[in-house]
Swiss-Prot record:
This is Nucleoside diphosphate kinase B. Belongs to the NDK family. GO terms for molecular function: ATP binding; metal ion binding; nucleoside diphosphate kinase activity. It is found in: Cytoplasm; Nucleus; Cell projection, Lamellipodium; Cell projection, Ruffle. It catalyses: a 2'-deoxyribonucleoside 5'-diphosphate + ATP = a 2'-deoxyribonucleoside 5'-triphosphate + ADP; a ribonucleoside 5'-diphosphate + ATP = a ribonucleoside 5'-triphosphate + ADP. It is an enzyme of class 2 (transferase). Its EC number is 2.7.4.6. Signal peptide: none annotated. The modification N-acetylmethionine is found at M1. Major role in the synthesis of nucleoside triphosphates other than ATP. Its cofactor is Mg(2+). It holds the Pfam family NDK.
């Protein structure tokens, strides 16, 4: 079972889309790997401009499918970005791109004691 870090960005929170996204079931440190990119300062300013709704999702290979492509224009309908986004710079949600990055990003935002062990009985009927 894979885990990934997911954050609804300030534009998604301000637009009141947290509930809609949920139906799909330290910004500077988080984006440190992008520090040499020309858009880094603007990205940090944007990610600090308002509240961020952070969470960890778990599933088997479904996270990218649910989020959609980074560019909303390339995202399929039925994905979060395909349904709710119109601009690559304001694509409302961040999702870890690899399992390794997910572990690092989850560690930046959450402490181990903040997780609750929850054994969902339906998983045995859904996943082999």
């Amino acid at each position: 079972m894979e885990q990934t870090f997911v954050a609804i960005k300030p534009d998604g929170v301000q637009r009141g889309l947290c509930g809609e996204v949920m139906k799909f079931i330290q910004p500077m440190k988080h984006y440190l790997d992008l520090k040499d990119m020309p858009f880094y300062a603007g990205l940090c300013k944007y990610m600090s401009s308002g509240p961020v709704f952070a969470m960890v999702w778990e599933g088997e290979g479904i996270v990218k499918m649910m989020l959609g492509e980074t560019n909303p224009a390339d995202s399929k309908p039925g994905s979060i970005r395909g349904d709710f986004c119109i601009n690559i710079g304001r694509n409302i949600i961040h999702g870890s791109d690899t399992v390794e990055n997910a572990k690092m990003e989850v560690g930046l935002w959450f402490k181990p004691e903040e997780f609750v062990a929850y054994a969902e009985k339906a998983k045995a009927w859904v996943y082999e």
